[in-house]
Curated annotation (Swiss-Prot):
Protein's recorded name: Nucleoside diphosphate kinase B
Annotated catalytic residues: 94
Binding locations of ATP: 9, 39, 70, 81, 91
Organism from which the protein derives: Merluccius bilinearis (Silver hake)
A GO MF label: metal ion binding
Positions carrying N-acetylmethionine: 1
SMART domains: NDK (SM00562)
Needed cofactors: Mg(2+)
Amino acid sequence: MEQTFIAIKPDGVQRGLCGEVMKFIQPMKHYLDLKDMPFYAGLCKYMSSGPVFAMVWEGEGIVKMMLGETNPADSKPGSIRGDFCINIGRNIIHGSDTVENAKMEVGLWFKPEEFVAYAEKAKAWVYE
């Protein structure tokens, strides 16, 4: 079972999309891998401009499919970005791109004791 880090970005929060997608931010650390990109300063400013709704999702290879492509124009209907995004600069949601990055990003935002472990009964009926 894979985990990935998910953050609804400020435009998604401001547009009231947290419920549709199901004031704590560390943009400088979170996007450190992009620090040499020309858009880095603007991205950090944007990610600090309002609250972010952070969470961890778990599933078998479905997270990227549910999010859609980074560019909403390339996202399929039925994905979060395909249904709710306006443009690439305001694509409402961040999702880890690899399992390795997910572990790092989850560690930036959450402490291990903040997770609640529970056995979902339906899981045995859905996953082999």
